[in-house]
Regions:
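Individual transmembrane alpha-helices with interfacial aromatic-anchor signatures
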Residues: 125-137
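Amphipathic alpha-helical interface elements
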Residues: 1-69, 80-91, 95-108, 137-163
């Protein structure tokens, strides 16, 4: 595989991860709303017509809960077999959102680093250091797909494949 093909595959896989994370959060919010009849009605009637500058009711769809809070609330409301392991999902999301991805010179793969806040001695601890290999992408895509399948089951949505 050429360097260009490897880079293009990296970009495609990164897009899959980001898209899956967004879908997972949105799906979890939809499950929470679905279980609250009042909120479900508001979401179905208000949000399709909402415009910038409008105000809407506060609910799981419109609140500012972060991914961790949203998934914890989802787990409290969803059936046991639909619950998600929150920690690896949030860890991945935080690494992609707040980490540093780079590659230079002879490096075969891009590298993802996430740093903590500086310590009293002025140094910065490394929280995460991963080579973004094909296996790393595949493991994370599989993990998110399993979580998405659980959310889909909790929503009782039909899975459709693109043709």
């Amino acid at each position: 595989m050429s360097e260009r093909e490897l880079f293009e595959l990296h970009v495609l896989n990164l897009g899959k991860l980001v898209g899956d994370l967004q879908s997972l959060e949105m799906g979890a919010r939809m499950v929470i709303v679905k279980l609250d009849q009042r909120a479900a009605k508001q979401v179905q009637t208000q949000l399709p017509q909402v415009k910038a500058g409008d105000s809407v009711e506060l609910n799981a769809f419109t609140n500012d809960d972060d991914l961790d809070q949203t998934l914890e609330k989802y787990n409290k409301r969803s059936p046991l077999d639909c619950r998600i392991d929150v920690v690896p999902v949030v860890r991945l999301r935080d690494a992609l959102a707040h980490g540093r991805t780079f590659g230079f010179g002879p490096m075969k793969y891009l590298r993802l680093l996430k740093f903590s806040r500086k310590t009293k001695d002025g140094r910065v601890p490394v929280e995460l250091a991963e080579d973004m290999t094909a296996e790393w992408f595949n493991e994370n895509i599989r993990m998110l797909n399993k979580a998405l399948e659980k959310v889909r089951k909790a929503l009782d949505y039909e899975k459709r494949d693109f043709v």
